[in-house]
Amino acid sequence: MKITLVTGTNTDVGKTIATAALVVRLQEQGKSVAVMKPAQTGEPEGSGDLATIHKLTGLDHLYECARFPEPLAPDVSAQRAGVSLLDFDDVVERIVGLEGKYEHLLIEGAGGLLVRLGAQQQPKRLWTLADLGAELHSRGYDTEFLIVTSTNLGSLNSAELTVEALRHRDLPCAGLIAGSHPTHAGLAEQLNLTDLPRVTDLPLLAVIPEGSGKLSTAEFRHASQQWFS
């Protein structure tokens, strides 16, 4: 089972729509695919990122590990709600339990790469999506990261910092996806489509137009095939 961890340079850069587009792309390649969201915050039951992915793609193989009420980092939201933090080993075991069921697992993070998602007992610390990727990589899984970035002014620095954090941990990154690219792009947005791969030395795999999350399932499945280079 190949595992792709979808992270972002920040919150609200388009990770969920990018993950949905990856679902369609993998399905078009004939792959069986599932999506996991370790921690969802700030959404009532029946809504959230996995619900959006289901709406856009029709995919039913969706796994959410924990949900916390306030739209904050998962560790903070859990603490404020007075509930247990998401346990690292539990998430790893849920992923291991999917082995053999799917050819490809997409794991969508929360916010950026180093957002604290929960607690790890050994060693005792808070854990991030980077920690999860490192653990899966060490277990021999074919693991890669994808970085979803905005294209607005300031995106180059945010993307470079995220890439540097992955390289510092020797974690493989397959490339970048430009999320929610404006229809009427300004100068910075236009230039960043060229500059992002130049400064990160990673390919820009797709450019997703803003408003794509409002498409119907059929519209999304058709349109998303045109976004990848």
Task: Name each model-derived stretch.
Residues M1-L5, S32:
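Extreme N-terminal starter segment of soluble prokaryotic enzymes
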Residues I17-G100:
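N-terminal phosphate/diphosphate-binding loop that engages ATP/GTP or pyrophosphate donors
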Residues V91-R125:
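Switch II (G3) loop of P-loop NTPases
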Residues Q120-D131, E160-V163, A188-T194:
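Charged helix-capping and loop-helix junction motifs
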Residues V163-S229:
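C-terminal lobe/tail of nucleotide-utilizing enzymes
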